[in-house]
């Protein structure tokens, strides 16, 4: 929070969103943190370099105005929930699902098995209040591939219904980072929680994307991070 007070966390965000549009300053401040505390540097990177940047680069105006102020001020500590226990860096094969329910206009986020736990996620074990969760989007019975969703995890430090989290335990280093596992049991989120810069689901469940090819859409989303 001292870094927030000193405006050291906002370099990389646009001015209209309370940032300074200074990527060089963002990189320099991140590099300098290693001189003080390597765990703090990684926590910094998770909050503003992964969680915040995913909302900025994969979301649209609604997400920017609704979520980014809390991210930049650290009112909403967050996680970047991509890696899974059984899938590692094979993001295209992740098992977490987000199935659209047109009756309620909600996505249902679910972890189908132990291999699909989000694992070694920074901020997950203790501090994370929300996460950008990568999941297979299902709508109208079809799998549209991996998409990113804003998913609340905790409220005032307590896990929300259906959200599970455990600490990954002691590591060989960087033990100031609360790496943990995340899993979801039929967690419902609003339709607007889909970070929809490249694709969207309409209220009736119909899916649309400016990138027709599923593979190209997948790599475009990853490349935007």
Outline where the language-model segments fall.
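Internal helix-loop-helix
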Residues: 1-75, 126-127
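Sensory/regulatory domains in signal-transduction proteins
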Residues: 54-57, 84-89, 116-117
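Internal maturation/activation junctions in enzymes
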Residues: 69-89
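Glycine-rich beta->alpha junctions and the first turn(s) of the following alpha-helix
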Residues: 169-225
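Glycine- and acidic
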Residues: 11-15, 32-36, 48-52, 114-118, ...
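A short core secondary-structure module
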Residues: 102-164
